[in-house]
From Swiss-Prot:
GO terms for molecular function: GTP binding; GTPase activity; microtubule binding. Keywords: Cytoplasm, GTP-binding, Nucleotide-binding. Residues 31-304 form the Dynamin-type G domain. This is Interferon-induced GTP-binding protein Mx3.
């Protein structure tokens, strides 16, 4: 195939295309989109014939779905006199092709291998490389033809499957969409062009190829000329028109070289289409030249963004790998040190968690904000309980006086009444205190479990060991704390405080009461103090409120201290002791270091991705 590119540009073309082909063969397309030309068309649009004419080899053709997998067609122009060379690769298979006539058979075998024998399709890529003096420097991706109706043996939704596969390629901004449309159909109704317009409404990355100009109805030739002149449906990249071998010429074994000569003669001699030939819009050689120029320009334009994307992906992959860690070493001595480091880091973070210090691992966990909130709620509960107590004292004191008053003369405080009421009030606080303990114990347990999950990601046995210890320590320490709390409340049943403390509280309470109560008139004052029972009641209320204030202040501090010591501080210390004890059990080391298969394979995949991206970056730097 004669290529009209000048020598200077040819020297630039191959390296550009080779760069992208190298990146694609590295598998970089798994990580980001690469510049490409995707070929799409309705069934029987002449798509295969165009690709055959460009590549110089026969591709699978026939009725129904012929292209059943995306086919990457890498064409490399060789010097005159150099031998034809072919290679096909897919999945883990790679095979040299000695004879151009074997290409069609090899593609069919690959499609049967990947999409199953029959008429199914697959998203997996087949790569076909062709080196020849008769091909342009060009890489295309051929996609299955758009099917409207399922045929025998095909799933009912085959049309949707194909469209989904096509969209996956053509929606990428890095892809030039080559839309093949026969001249003898209404271009506006072709599904391939409609799909291209959906993803590229302005037509900035869509190039139209008209085929089968020999089948144009008489009188409609000018419409074809108008389409190619971009006057019907506008595409920024415009249109080309080609005439490939028809079925009759294939049956007559007309060679591709002869078909190119016939195509040239057809356009030059055509009454209406010759103008398109003169303008450089017609024939396969002109199409090859345009596609090569378009691809190279597209690659050059995409390179800066590609470099940015690779850098971003490298950074992202490094960060992900850090989360998965390095994995256990192979050497047995190093494995022990690896386990020691892992367990020590976890236990140190557990201690830091219990003291409110920053975690070495960098994990964002904080148990103290929860404790502060919960202890604040406990203090609020005590205050509200005191307010309720104050409100009901008057009625209850009167009832208790009737029940417990003995031989005392009027005006004397009944200590028994005072004691019973205080004990009853404090007793009501016991269960809320135990409930608060359990809530905080659960919250602390959850935080330690989160720390274990973060510290032992990918090591299920080590994580299980830590979780088992956390659950056991939680049960024991919670039980001990509950016992201590209940003992505290038993001690609170002894009505006691230092005389000076009580006197101070009583004086404070009297002062508050006097400040809150308006000064009574002499008449009212004499009435109040002449009523012995009322005087007793007023004084009793002062004593009750004063003592409750002392007791509640004790409980406001003591309950949180018990909880914090046993449920957090002692919990962390015990967890540290037991986890470090695990390191003494030499027989369990291998079991503990057994890695989660998914994590191991994920790390391996990330390491491969990192190598792939670093190699890609080096290609771009060297380019």
């Amino acid at each position: 195939m004669n290529n009209t590119l000048n020598q200077h540009y040819e020297e630039k073309v191959r390296p550009c295309i080779d760069l992208i082909d190298s990146l694609r063969s590295l598998g970089v397309e798994k990580d980001l989109a690469l510049p490409a030309i995707a070929v799409i068309g309705d069934q029987s649009s002449g798509k295969s014939s165009v690709l055959e004419a460009l590549s110089g080899v026969a591709l699978p053709r026939g009725s129904g779905i012929v292209t059943r997998c995306p086919l990457e067609l890498k064409m490399k122009r060789k010097r005159e006199g150099e031998e034809w060379h072919g290679k096909i690769s897919y999945q883990d298979h790679e095979e040299e092709i000695e004879d151009p006539s074997d290409v069609e058979k090899k593609i069919r075998e690959a499609q049967d291998e990947m999409a199953g024998v029959g008429v199914g399709i697959s998203d997996d890529l087949i790569s076909l490389e062709i080196g020849s003096p008769d091909v342009p420097d060009l890489t295309l991706i051929d996609l299955p033809g758009i099917a409207r109706v399922a045929v025998k043996g095909q799933p009912e939704n085959i049309g949707e499957q194909i469209k989904r596969l096509i969209r996956k390629f053509i929606m990428k901004q890095e892809t030039i969409n080559l839309v093949v449309v026969p001249c003898n159909v209404d271009i506006a109704t072709t599904e391939a062009l409609q799909m291209a317009q959906e993803v590229d409404p302005e037509g900035e990355r869509t190039l139209g190829i008209l085929t089968k100009p020999d089948l144009v109805d008489k009188g409609t030739e000018e419409t074809v000329v108008d389409i190619v002149h971009n006057e019907v449906i506008h595409l920024t990249k415009g249109y080309m028109i080609v005439k490939c071998r028809g079925q009759k010429e294939i049956m007559e074994r007309v060679s591709l070289t002869e078909a190119t000569e016939r195509e040239k003669a057809f356009f030059k001699e055509h009454a209406h289409l010759s103008t398109l030939y003169d303008e450089g819009h017609a024939t396969i050689p002109k199409l090859a030249e345009k596609l090569t120029l378009e691809l190279v320009h597209h690659i050059e334009k995409s390179l800066p963004r590609l470099e940015e994307q690779i850098e971003a992906k490298l950074s992202e992959t490094h960060a992900e790998l850090e989360r998965y860690g390095t994995g256990p070493p192979e050497d047995s001595a190093e494995r022990i040190y690896f386990l020691i480091d892992k367990v020590t880091a976890f236990t140190q973070d557990a201690i830091n968690l219990s003291t409110g210090e920053e975690l070495k691992s960098g994990v964002r966990l904080n148990v103290f904000s929860t404790l502060r909130q919960e202890f604040g709620k406990w203090k609020l509960h005590l205050d509200r309980s005191g307010e309720n107590f104050n409100q009901r004292i008057e009625g209850e004191v009167s009832n208790y006086e009737k029940t417990y008053r003995g031989r005392e003369l009027p005006g004397f405080i009944n200590y028994k009444t005072f004691e019973v009421m205080v004990k009853d009030q404090i007793k009501q606080l016991e269960e809320p205190a135990v409930k608060k303990l359990k809530e905080i114990s659960d919250a602390v347990r959850k935080v330690f479990l989160l720390l274990a999950q973060s510290s032992f990601t990918g090591f299920p046995n080590l994580l299980k060991s830590a979780k088992t210890k956390i659950e056991a320590i939680k049960q024991v320490n919670e039980s001990t704390a509950e016992s201590m709390l209940r003992t505290q409340f038993k001690m609170e049943m002894i009505v006691y405080t230092q005389d000076s403390t009580y006197s101070h509280s009583l004086s404070e309470r009297k002062r508050e009461e006097e400040d809150d109560r308006p000064l009574p008139t002499p008449k009212i004052r004499s009435t109040i103090f002449s009523t012995d029972n009322h005087a007793t009641l007023q004084e009793m209320m002062l004593h009750l409120k004063s003592y409750y204030r002392i007791s509640s202040q004790r409980l406001a501090d003591q309950i949180p201290m018990v909880i914090r010591y046993l449920v957090l501080q002692e919990f962390a210390s015990q967890l540290q002791r037991e986890m470090l004890q695990t390191l003494q059990e030499k027989d369990n080391i291998e079991q503990l270091l057994k890695e989660d298969f998914d994590i191991g394979s994920k790390r391996a995949a990330l390491q491969n991705k990192l190598k792939r991206l670093m190699k890609a970056r080096s290609y771009l730097v060297e380019f």
